[in-house]
Amino acid sequence: MERDLAAAIATAMAEILGGAIALQMLFHIPIKVGSMLILVVVLFCEFTNAYKRIEKLIMLFVSLIGFCFLIEICMVKIDWGAAATGWVKPVFPSHAMPVIMSVLGAVVMPHNLFLHSEIIQSRKWNLKEEAVIQRQLKFEFKDTLFSMIIGWAINSAMILMAAATFYQRGENRVDDLTTAGNMLTPLLGNEATVIFAIALLLAGLSSSITAGMAGGTIFSGIFNKPYGIATKETRQGVLITMIPAALIILLIRSPFQGLIYSQMLLAVQLPITIFTQIYLTSSKKVMGKYANSTGLKMVLWAIAIVVTALNIGLFVTGF
């Protein structure tokens, strides 16, 4: 649990930083000041809204993020054939392992698996009826799958936009989000920069909120209590997640490298979560008749081995 709380802090740092960079792009607010503003807004949302309201707020943000990137994708010329090939047979440039692992960590976000589980468990159901249990399991599966697909789609949209906008036009050195946003202006017009910044701000806010909720869920779980913003454990978990994340931003020199390595840490932690969850969901003692089938276990172990191999590759290449 402590490792997953650290993962939540790493995520919160990246999301607060992303929101702060967006504020800098939109209003020229210094990143460190912007980080504190994002922290205040997120804590206000966490502590003053019931979960249902936060859930609706996050759904609104995610919808707007998707809409923003849809507009940006429509503004550039995408080589969809090359994109399809890249999805199936990706090419890994030299020294790109930290970026690859950071994308993996950003999409999967191991701490959110605990948040998804808590969301399902928090609903009041009659768990003595087989039909209700089956419905719960299907809902959990769909909730997690939908979240993963949305995360994958938004990350893919950003990669496609970067490839079509920068690299096809010879801009091969983009190592800062602010620079990336500014470079969109001469290529696509000022509207593209504003849309990019708005999407980044919404992504930072929504992801920071979920990171705080995940931290609250994990910390409450340490004391065997459910998530509830009115409880002491949940509030402490949110604060333990969000405040250190914001303080770390005040200490780092390169915001962009901070983003990369914080998300890379999530990927490094991912095998621990995967192996633990495979063990628990495959245990008949824990899951009873709902334990993983032999075929599903083989698939899950294969995924775990691949993710572990990627992490080994990360350390072998020396970052």
Q: Model-found features: residue ranges?
A:
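Extracellular/periplasmic helix-exit of transmembrane alpha-helices
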Residues: I120-E129, I149-T179
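Membrane-interface loop-to-helix entry segments
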Residues: L37-I38, E46-V76, M264-L266, L270, ...
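Loop-to-transmembrane helix boundary motifs in multi-pass membrane proteins
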Residues: S35, F146, E191-T193, L205, ...
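Select transmembrane alpha-helical segments in multipass membrane proteins
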Residues: M1-A6, F92-L104, W152-A162, P186-L205, ...
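Transmembrane alpha-helical segments of multi-pass small-molecule transport proteins
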Residues: M1, L26-T48, L64-F69, G228-L247, ...
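Helix-loop-helix module between adjacent transmembrane segments
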Residues: M1-E15, A20-A50, G105-A106, L202-S207
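C-terminal membrane-solvent junction of multi-pass transporters and transport-like membrane proteins
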Residues: L57-L60, T217, T231-Q236, P255, ...
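Hydrophobic alpha-helical segments and their helix-loop junctions in multi-pass secondary transporters
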Residues: S63-K89, M97, L104-I120, T276-K285, ...
